[in-house]
């Protein structure tokens, strides 16, 4: 994969650092052991966070700032990591989708970064460009229908948008048939060390729960 960061993102977030994780995988419907880890993380949050204080987590606070700088209301279009943790703090379980989606969610809530998880074989081309959504740009969010991505950071392939920090696109989503994982960690707080730790956690989880092969990652700016 090649990742290009457009000038618009650099101008609103000059410290941005991302990580692109790739691996060959075998997905499954459910992992009891993985869900034990997710439930333990939820319990930790309920003992240490509130729905207000979670906004102060570095990765979440930085993503919210970028939304505002791009003209988007982060309380209406929440970063996915914030939405997931908020759901846990309300005493609700996360939606159980499949093992790949669930482990990406665990990595996201563990460190607070919004992470795009994709079936790499569904991309049009081998290059993704990170820019800002345009007014009227078509985008079908997973389980959300058509999403207004104007003012949202968005990754695009040759066909169009594939991922925002709020929701990934139906066209390139992961499923049980996914064999090529691409995960993008969005470090709007500029903390390369934590972005790397998040990428390494994804690889650890993929190797443990999805028979990961040839897993690797690289940093991009």
Language-model region placement:
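Charge-biased, low-complexity intrinsically disordered regions
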Residues: 1-221
């Amino acid at each position: 994969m090649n990742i290009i960061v457009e000038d618009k993102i650099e101008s609103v977030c000059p410290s941005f650092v991302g990580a692109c994780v790739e691996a060959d995988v075998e997905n499954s419907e459910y992992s009891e052991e993985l869900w034990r880890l997710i439930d333990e993380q939820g319990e930790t949050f309920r003992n240490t966070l509130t729905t207000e204080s979670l906004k102060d987590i570095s990765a979440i606070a930085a993503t919210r700032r970028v939304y505002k700088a791009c003209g988007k209301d982060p309380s209406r279009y929440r970063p996915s990591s914030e939405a997931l943790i908020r759901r846990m703090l309300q005493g609700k379980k996360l939606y159980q989708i499949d093992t790949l989606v669930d482990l990406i969610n665990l990595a996201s809530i563990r460190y607070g970064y919004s992470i795009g998880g994709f079936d790499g074989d569904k991309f049009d081309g081998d290059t993704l460009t990170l820019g800002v959504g345009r007014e009227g740009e078509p985008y079908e969010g997973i389980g959300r229908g058509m999403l207004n991505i104007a003012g949202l950071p968005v990754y695009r392939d040759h066909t169009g948008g594939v991922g925002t920090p709020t929701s990934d696109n139906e066209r390139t989503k992961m499923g049980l048939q996914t064999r090529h994982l691409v995960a993008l960690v969005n470090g709007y707080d500029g903390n390369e060390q934590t972005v790397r730790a998040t990428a390494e956690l994804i690889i650890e989880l993929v190797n443990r729960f999805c028979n990961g092969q040839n897993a690797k990652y690289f940093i991009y700016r």
